[in-house]
């Protein structure tokens, strides 16, 4: 029996997620009010990382897989995806996030 999924969003994350699910044998329905070239992904920069996600044992894994896919997409200039090092500044000292070791 086929696994069914609904992906909401036609931007980079939504489309990438839909492709991964299809490649894994899922039946995918994609819903979005806009598609390229009218998505936020087409005109805006994005900051991506697993944010306030749990359980860590699972989210670090999917975060790492997502990062790897986004990194692959940077090889094709037609995707418009570029990775840039960023810095976050906090008022108080923060410990490194659990997912930090899963990215380069």
Question: What is each of the regions a protein language model found here?
Answer:
Residues 13, 40, 58:
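Short, contiguous, pocket-lining structural segments
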Residues 20:
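Rossmann-fold NAD(P)-dependent oxidoreductase module
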Residues 46-104:
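Dinucleotide-binding Rossmann-like beta1-alpha1 core, especially the glycine-rich loop
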Residues 8, 31, 89-90:
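Short hydrophobic segments within beta-strands
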Residues 1-13:
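Beta1/beta-strand and adjacent pyrophosphate-binding region of the FAD-binding site
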Residues 23-42:
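Glycine-rich FAD pyrophosphate-binding loop
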